[in-house]
Amino acid sequence: MKVTNIRTLVVNAEMRNWVFCKVETDQPGLFGWGEGSLEWKTRAVVGVIEDLAPMVIGEDPRRIEHIYEKLYRQSFWRLGVIGMSGISAIEQALWDIKGKLLGVPVYELLGGQVRDKVRMYTHLGGGDMRSVYETFEVGPLIDLALKVIGNGYTAIKVVFVPYSEPLEGIGKVKRFATLMGKLREAVGDAVDVMIDFHGRTYPAMAIQYILAVQEFFPYFCEEPVPPENVEALLEVRQSVRVPIATGERLVGRHQFRPIFEQRACHVIQPDLCHCGGIMEAKKIAAMAETYQMGVAPHNPLGPVANAVALAFALSTPNFLIQEDMLTDVPWRWDVVRSSLKTENGYWLPTQVPGLGIEVDEEQARKHPFKQEVMHSTTIRAKDGAVLDW
């Protein structure tokens, strides 16, 4: 059996373009799908998949680890987030092929189920771009949060951390604490609330913001500082009593290693569409388990990524909770028919072989590539300096 072709399919979903990767074989009707969606880098990911494809064509698709090693090590230049997103998409598709070939869901190939169902959380608006990133007032915040809870979720993530300079006055801190307090009052103690800092703050302000909301018990505070500085992250973790999460912008187990060695967080968040794929994420999770850290994978991406996330979550012992954005666009399930089922804030296992999805390429082509809305280019300090989005 050999890989005969690799091609990409780009689907614009407003907030981001989904980059689907199809790996075809010489066996009639046997192919697999993966996803490497990366905001504002769509054409680069498509290009890197095209560049990597010759290293895979002609290989036996069942030799997944061998192909990964070839792509990662024989490219000579170590791959960053663009290259690793390309590898991730190809690697996922190989698992889809192998599951179909053996007639089992991918999670059965990863050691089988360690849990009966997978807890989910979503964002304001269920992933609607403007609700997620443009809700900074109490009224809309409460309305959108209650709608999410009404849809069965028991956990929600919010992104209302102020855009911040290295130091800010008391006004932003008080406003942030008020929002979290009103949200906790509205949803009650039975709902977990995660706060995504989006890497917007330096340690001094991150610590002040977190201390201001500790009494409302966030489930975790995510990426309180930009991802480049492990020591800064450790400073935050040691200064607060709220669990700290990070990792969505790290790729490969080697970038996670300093986080583990310095115990710089409590929860890691690899993105299976960027970190190197399913097996690399399993290795990262195993490292985290050694350090008694939980795993809450990053996944605001497309429907292929959802299927990948389900397989990972069902088979990973230290998994905590799974991010989703299932209502980002109304036609999501027209493009990808999925065996994914939800119930009371949980994903349920599928018995469909492979990843359990079918991509409708005709429907997908109704939503061709468009340049994504670039929120980040408008974020400025009072003096006009650029801030982290």
Give residue ranges: language-model regions.
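Structured beta-strand/loop patches that form or line metal/cofactor-binding pockets in enzymes
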Residues: M1-W33, S37-L38, A44, D328-W333, ...
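Conserved, mostly hydrophobic/aromatic
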Residues: V3, G29, L52, I90, ...
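Shared catalytic-loop signature of beta/alpha-barrel
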Residues: V23, G47, L52, H66, ...
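Metal- or metallocofactor-binding catalytic centers and their adjacent structured scaffolds
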Residues: D26-L102, D388
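Glycine- and other small-residue-rich loops at beta-strand/loop junctions that grip anionic moieties
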Residues: I87, K172, I195-Y202, E222-V225, ...
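Glycine-rich, aromatic-flanked loop segments that form ligand/cofactor-binding clefts
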Residues: E91-S131
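Metal-dependent enolase-superfamily TIM-barrel catalytic cores that perform enediolate-based chemistry
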Residues: K117-S239
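C-terminal extensions of enzymes
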Residues: V336-W389
